[in-house]
Amino acid sequence: MFRTLVKTESMALESQTVSVRYFELRTLRGGRRYSAEIWLAPGDRVILDGDSVVNLEARAARLVPATVYSRLLAGRANAA
């Protein structure tokens, strides 16, 4: 089973840009599944799975800001 790149986009949050790549995967039964690979930093990524690219785009739009800001807060807490 191979993934096919369907779409790429960048999301800008204040001073950071996050890369999002969307893939399509054919299942053994001929169905289609989709995944989004969100690159937050080198070696730091989040992978989402879904039934459609539209669904993944909506989930990524909500998840990316929350993830970036929570990691910023966690970094500040560790520095203090």
Where would I find each of the regions flagged by the language model?
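Negatively charged, low-complexity tracts enriched in Asp/Glu with abundant Ser/Thr
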Residues: 1-21, 77-80
